[in-house]
């Protein structure tokens, strides 16, 4: 059920194209975008002249409802939405954000929580692991029988 490497064609994913956005380095505009919870992808309702929601595709990438500290914005021309480290910040550098919702290379190891819910029946094994999806083991339920919708040896 869970091989060491999942080919990209076997994963449940939307068919979308890659979009690259040039993010503004205007702090006032960024603060306004952040405070209003503007979605960079996912079809959120937000009206501006430069960025139109209908031109954006993707899932779940958005600015938080609070203003992130500038230490989480890295100057290497990569805009990190989460998990940034402390670094210097140069607001004059234009930052690019690449939206690529569909996988282009095979994934290895676990399949993540969303794909896990699609693959396994929640009534049999609803929340088998705690912690972030990256900490899941490679093999989830080695003795799960698809034909009988049960786990072998589990009463």
Curated annotation (Swiss-Prot):
Pfam families: Adeno_PVIII. Signal peptide: none annotated. Cleaved by the viral protease during virion maturation. May cause the middle segment to be shed from the capsid. Keywords: Capsid protein, Host nucleus, Late protein, Phosphoprotein, Virion. The record marks 43-44, 84-85 as: Cleavage. Residues 44-84 form a propeptide. All late proteins expressed from the major late promoter are produced by alternative splicing and alternative polyadenylation of the same gene giving rise to non-overlapping ORFs. A leader sequence is present in the N-terminus of all these mRNAs and is recognized by the viral shutoff protein to provide expression although conventional translation via ribosome scanning from the cap has been shut off in the host cell. Interacts with the peripentonal hexons as well as the hexons in the facets. Part of a complex composed of the core-capsid bridging protein, the endosome lysis protein VI and the hexon-linking protein VIII; these interactions bridge the virus core to the capsid. This is Pre-hexon-linking protein VIII. It comes from Bovine adenovirus 2 (BAdV-2). The gene is L4.
């Amino acid at each position: 059920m869970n091989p060491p490497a999942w080919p990209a064609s076997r994963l449940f994913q939307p068919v979308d194209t890659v979009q690259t956005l040039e993010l503004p380095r205007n702090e006032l505009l960024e603060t306004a975008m952040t405070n209003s919870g503007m979605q960079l992808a996912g079809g959120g309702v937000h009206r501006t002249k430069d960025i139109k929601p209908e031109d954006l595709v993707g899932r779940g990438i958005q600015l938080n409802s609070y203003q992130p500290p500038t230490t989480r914005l890295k100057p290497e021309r990569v805009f990190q939405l989460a998990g940034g480290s402390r670094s210097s910040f140069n607001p004059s550098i234009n930052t690019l954000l690449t939206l690529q919702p569909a996988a282009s290379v095979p994934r290895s190891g676990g399949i993540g929580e969303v794909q896990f819910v699609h693959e396994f029946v929640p009534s049999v094994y609803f929340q088998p692991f705690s912690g972030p999806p990256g900490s899941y083991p490679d093999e989830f339920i080695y003795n799960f029988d698809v034909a009988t919708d049960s786990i072998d040896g589990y009463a």
